[in-house]
């Protein structure tokens, strides 16, 4: 059971695939509330990440958790080469759009892919912000309207369509430990 697994985790550990329905759902879908053991884990310092992959993002779970005051700490993808030719699309921009469609405020979506991951990795002095002296991968995006977004169960929602218009990758060699 997930409750037993959560008890083994320490503050700062990250639970990924937090918005999936099976095998471990973080919400009671009948009451649309976050399970007590999940909330207790967050109170102990356990972090929760989206990790959208082939079977790990469900709009109903995400909407219920976010509405119950339980947004993800970080947003990531579980994107692998074998996912390129599949029906489930989950680029980081699409995953960000799905979280916004599920009720997460846009600024919180952006923080969950920038400064929060940097802080979790204890690199907040080097990453996660646009400040002189910091490393940054920069992406200029343009919102071009809305689009249809699909979760792994086939449920659809309307959400923002963001297109990358320009990108620049930093040289991270100065961060080597």
Model-inferred region functions:
Residues 135-177:
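C-terminal cap of metal-dependent C-N hydrolases
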Residues 10-17, 70-74, 95-97, 127-132, ...:
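Short, structured secondary-structure boundary patches
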Residues 60-143:
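His/Asp/Glu-enriched, well-ordered alpha-helical/loop segment
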Residues 2, 8, 54, 96, ...:
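Detector for methionine-enriched segments
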Residues 6, 76, 124-127, 146, ...:
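Generic secondary-structure boundary/loop-capping signal
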Residues 20-21, 43-46, 75-79, 101-105, ...:
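Short, surface-exposed, polar/charged, turn-prone segments marking secondary-structure boundaries
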Residues 1-64, 68-86:
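Active-site core of metal-dependent hydrolases
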């Amino acid at each position: 059971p997930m409750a037993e697994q959560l008890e083994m985790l320490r503050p700062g550990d990250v639970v990924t695939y937090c918005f999936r329905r099976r095998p471990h759902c973080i919400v009671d879908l009948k009451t649309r509330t976050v399970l007590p053991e999940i909330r207790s884990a967050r109170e102990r310092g356990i972090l929760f990440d989206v990790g959208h992959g082939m079977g790990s993002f469900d709009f109903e779970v995400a909407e219920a958790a976010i509405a119950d005051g339980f947004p993800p700490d970080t947003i990531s993808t579980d994107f692998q080469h074998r996912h390129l030719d599949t029906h489930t699309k989950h680029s980081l921009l699409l995953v960000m759009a799905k979280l916004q469609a599920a009720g997460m405020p846009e600024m919180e979506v952006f923080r969950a892919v920038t400064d929060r991951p940097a802080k979790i990795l204890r690199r907040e002095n080097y990453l996660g912000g646009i400040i002189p002296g910091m490393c940054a991968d920069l992406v200029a995006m343009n919102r071009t309207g809305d689009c249809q977004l699909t979760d792994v169960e086939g449920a659809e929602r309307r959400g923002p369509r963001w297109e990358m218009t320009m990108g620049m990758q930093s040289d991270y060699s100065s961060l080597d430990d």
